[in-house]
Swiss-Prot record:
Function: Small subunit of the glutamine-dependent carbamoyl phosphate synthetase (CPSase). CPSase catalyzes the formation of carbamoyl phosphate from the ammonia moiety of glutamine, carbonate, and phosphate donated by ATP, constituting the first step of 2 biosynthetic pathways, one leading to arginine and/or urea and the other to pyrimidine nucleotides. The small subunit (glutamine amidotransferase) binds and cleaves glutamine to supply the large subunit with the substrate ammonia.
Keywords associated with the record: Amino-acid biosynthesis, Arginine biosynthesis, ATP-binding, Glutamine amidotransferase, Ligase, Nucleotide-binding, Pyrimidine biosynthesis
Gene3D superfamilies: 3.40.50.880, Carbamoyl-phosphate synthase small subunit, N-terminal domain
Protein name: Carbamoyl phosphate synthase small chain
Organism: Leptospira interrogans serogroup Icterohaemorrhagiae serovar copenhageni (strain Fiocruz L1-130)
Enzyme class name: ligase
Tagged with keyword ATP-binding: yes
PROSITE patterns: GATASE_TYPE_1
Active site: 253 (nucleophile), 336, 338
C-alpha cells in the first residue's frame, strides 16, 4: 500500500496508508459514529465536500452491494479509518470497499488514530483537511488545505441535485401526487414515500414552485442535502410560496432547515454536528424517545414563538429536531426517519405525513 497523509488546517499531520484511489482531496473533516452502513454513508449526498472519519475501528468487513447505494455514486470527498479489512465476509458482497473507492476515484487512508482525531474534532470543531497519497510529506499539502473555502455560505444543493425531473416508483393506483424537491435526496427516502402510497415525482432544486403547482401536486416534500441552508434563497422563496398556498409539507434534515428559514427563523453552524445512528430524540407530543440516525452540521435556532413550537428535541444537546406551525399541515424533522443506515424507530413519520395529506384534502 502507498503511504498517505491526513493534513488538518492547523498543521496537524497524521501518517497512514492509502487503500482508496491514489489521488488527493480536500474537504471538511467530520466523524460518524455508526458501527455499520459505510456504503450508505459514503453515497449520501449530504456528505458532499466532506471527508468522513468512521469511529468504529474496523471497516470493510462485509464488502459492497448495489442495494446499499443511497445515490448513484460516492458523494464524500474521502474516507478515514483505523483499520481497513480487505477480505469481506458476506455472501452478498460483490466487491471490496477498496475497489469501490477506486471505482469512483475517492482517496482513503487507514492506520489513523481515529479516537485521537475524533476527540480533536469534538474539542475544536470540524476542521478543513485533506488526504494526500504520496511517498513523502510536502508543505504544499497544507497550502491546498488552507485554500479550501469551507462549506459555510456554499450552495452545495445545486451540486448534487438532479439535472431533470423524474418519476420514482409507480404512480399506478396512487391517491396523492407528491412533489419532491431534490437537494440531495437519499434513495431510501424515495423508497419509503413510494411504499407509503405517494405518487412520487422528483424535481431539481431550483424548479419554481409555481411550475410544479401548474403541473399538479397534492403535497410537497423537501429533501435532505449537504451544507449550509442559508444561501439557498431560491429554496426559501419556493417554500414560502408553497406555504402561502397551504400545501401539506414535509421536510427532512436540510428540508427541515429550509422550512425554518422560510418561517423567519435562523440557523447556525454546529461545532461538530450530529452524525451517527444513536441520537436520542424526544417526541414532545407523545413523550416518547426515539433513537435516530442523523447527519447534519447546521441546526435551526429556537426562537420560542408560541405558534411555531418545537415538536422534537435532541436529548444530548437540546437542539431543535422538529418544528410545527399552528393551523398548518406541516411535518419537519432534523433527523433521518428513513435510517439507511440506522434504527427504524421513526419510520412511522412517512405514514403520518400520508395521513396528514389525506386529512388536509378532505378539508
Amino acid at each position: 500500500m502507498m503511504k498517505a497523509f491526513l493534513v488538518l488546517d492547523n498543521g496537524t499531520i497524521f501518517e497512514g496508508e492509502s487503500f482508496g484511489y491514489e489521488t488527493e482531496s480536500v474537504g471538511e473533516i467530520v466523524f460518524n459514529t455508526s458501527m455499520a452502513g459505510y456504503q450508505e454513508i459514503l453515497t449520501d449526498p449530504s456528505y458532499c465536500n466532506q471527508i468522513i472519519t468512521l469511529t468504529y475501528p474496523m471497516i470493510g468487513n462485509y464488502g459492497i452491494h448495489p442495494d446499499n447505494m443511497e445515490s448513484s455514486k460516492i458523494q464524500a470527498s474521502g474516507l478515514i479509518v483505523k483499520e481497513y479489512v480487505d477480505l469481506p465476509s458476506n455472501f452478498k458482497s460483490e466487491k471490496t470497499l477498496s475497489q469501490f473507492l477506486k471505482e469512483y476515484k475517492i482517496p482513503a487512508i487507514q492506520g489513523i488514530d481515529t479516537r485521537k482525531l475524533t476527540r480533536f474534532i469534538r474539542t475544536n470543531g470540524s476542521p478543513n483537511g485533506g488526504i494526500f497519497v504520496a511517498s513523502e510529506y510536502s508543505p504544499s499539502f497544507l497550502e491546498k488545505v488552507k485554500s479550501f473555502p469551507g462549506i459555510i455560505n456554499a450552495d452545495l444543493a445545486e451540486v448534487v441535485t438532479t439535472s431533470s425531473k423524474y418519476i420514482f416508483g409507480t404512480h399506478t393506483g396512487k391517491k396523492f401526487k407528491l412533489a419532491v424537491y431534490d437537494y440531495g435526496v437519499k434513495t431510501n427516502i424515495l423508497r419509503l414515500l413510494d411504499a407509503n402510497g405517494f405518487a412520487v415525482t422528483v424535481y431539481p432544486a431550483k424548479t419554481p414552485s409555481e411550475e410544479i403547482m401548474k403541473e399538479g401536486t397534492d403535497a410537497f416534500f423537501l429533501s435532505n442535502g449537504p451544507g449550509d441552508p442559508a444561501p439557498l434563497d431560491y429554496a426559501i422563496a419556493s417554500t414560502q410560496k408553497i406555504m402561502e398556498k397551504r400545501y401539506p409539507l414535509f421536510g427532512i434534515c436540510l428540508g427541515h432547515q429550509i422550512i425554518g428559514l422560510s418561517l423567519g427563523k435562523k440557523t447556525e453552524k454546529m461545532k461538530f454536528g450530529h452524525r451517527g445512528g444513536n441520537q436520542p430524540v424526544k417526541n414532545l407530543e407523545t413523550g416518547q424517545v426515539e433513537i435516530t440516525s442523523q447527519n447534519h452540521g447546521f441546526a435551526v435556532i429556537d426562537d420560542q414563538k408560541q405558534d411555531e413550537p418545537i415538536s422534537f428535541l435532541n436529548l444530548n444537546d437540546h437542539t431543535v429536531e422538529g418544528i410545527l406551525k399552528s393551523g398548518y399541515p406541516l411535518l419537519t424533522v432534523q433527523y433521518h426517519p428513513e435510517s439507511a443506515p440506522g434504527p427504524n424507530d421513526s419510520r412511522y413519520l412517512f405514514q403520518k405525513f400520508y395521513d396528514l395529506v389525506e386529512k388536509t384534502k378532505k378539508g
